[in-house]
C-alpha cells in the first residue's frame, strides 16, 4: 500500500492477470492462497494449460510451503531476510543497477538464473512479492515497470484495504505515552494479528477506556475494559451499522 501510494498517488494494491505471463516469479507471495484477497487461481490456471507445446513457468522463493510453492515448477526455500536480498539481486539484473546486496552464496546461482530469465521474458514476465516492506514493494513495482509487464495492472487496482502499519505503530506509541483516553475497536483483533502484540497490550493498559466490539471474547476483548457483543449476520438482517 505504501509503495503503491508513493509511486502512483493512490492507496491501493496492484492487480495481476497471470494468464498474460509466460514467466511468473513469486518472492514470498502465496498468490494461489488468500494473498491480496485471493482469486488469482483462475488467471494462473489459464496460463498453465499447454498450448502449442508451451505454458507459463513459475518460480517460487519462500520460507514455508504454500499452495503457490506446491504448484511451482521450481521452489527455492529461503528466509525472509534472504528473500529481500534476492529481490535486490533480481532488481540489479533486470534494471542493470548495482545496488549493494548480501545474498547468501548458496542462493546466488539460482536467483541469478531466475533474474536472467525474467529479464529475457520482458513484458511476458511478472514478479510478485508478499514481503510487508515498503522498500521491497518499491523494488517489485520498479522491476515490473522496466519489464513493461502485461500481467501487472495499475489501472484495475484492488482496494480491499487501506490500513497503515506506520499509523498503527504511532497509535501504540501514543497509547504507551498515555495520550489516548478512549480507544474503540470493531471488526479487528489486534492482540492476535499484530506482529508485536505485546507492545499493543502494554499500551492498551494505559488507555482509560478501551471498547472491543466482537462476536466472542477474543484476545483483544479479553484485555479491553469493555467487551461489547455484536450480532452475527443472521441476527442483524443487514440493518445494523457499527
Residue ranges and their predicted role:
Residues 1-242:
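Cofactor-pocket helix-loop regions in the catalytic cores of large enzyme subunits
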Amino acid at each position: 500500500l505504501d509503495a503503491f501510494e508513493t509511486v502512483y498517488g493512490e492507496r491501493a494494491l496492484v492487480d495481476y492477470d497471470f494468464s498474460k505471463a509466460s514467466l511468473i516469479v513469486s518472492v514470498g507471495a502465496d498468490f494461489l492462497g488468500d494473498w491480496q484477497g485471493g482469486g488469482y487461481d483462475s488467471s494462473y490456471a489459464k496460463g498453465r494449460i499447454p498450448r502449442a507445446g508451451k505454458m507459463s513457468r513459475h518460480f517460487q522463493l519462500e520460507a514455508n510451503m504454500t499452495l503457490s510453492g506446491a504448484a511451482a515448477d521450481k521452489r527455492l526455500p529461503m528466509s525472509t531476510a534472504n528473500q529481500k536480498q534476492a529481490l535486490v539481486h533480481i532488481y540489479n539484473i533486470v534494471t542493470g543497477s548495482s545496488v549493494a546486496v548480501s545474498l547468501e552464496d548458496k542462493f546466488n546461482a539460482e536467483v541469478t538464473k531466475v533474474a536472467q530469465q525474467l529479464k529475457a521474458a520482458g513484458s511476458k514476465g511478472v514478479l510478485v512479492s508478499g514481503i510487508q516492506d515498503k522498500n521491497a514493494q518499491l523494488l517489485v513495482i520498479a522491476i515490473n515497470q522496466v519489464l513493461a509487464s502485461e500481467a501487472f495492472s495499475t489501472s484495475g487496482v484492488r482496494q480491499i484495504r487501506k490500513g497503515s502499519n506506520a499509523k498503527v505503530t504511532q497509535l501504540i506509541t501514543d497509547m504507551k505515552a498515555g495520550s489516548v483516553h478512549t480507544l474503540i475497536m470493531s471488526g479487528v483483533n489486534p492482540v492476535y494479528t499484530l506482529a508485536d502484540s505485546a507492545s499493543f497490550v502494554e499500551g492498551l493498559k494505559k488507555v482509560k477506556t478501551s471498547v472491543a466490539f466482537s462476536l466472542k471474547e477474543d484476545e483483544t476483548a479479553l484485555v479491553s475494559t469493555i467487551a461489547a457483543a455484536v450480532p452475527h449476520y443472521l441476527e442483524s438482517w443487514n440493518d445494523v451499522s457499527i
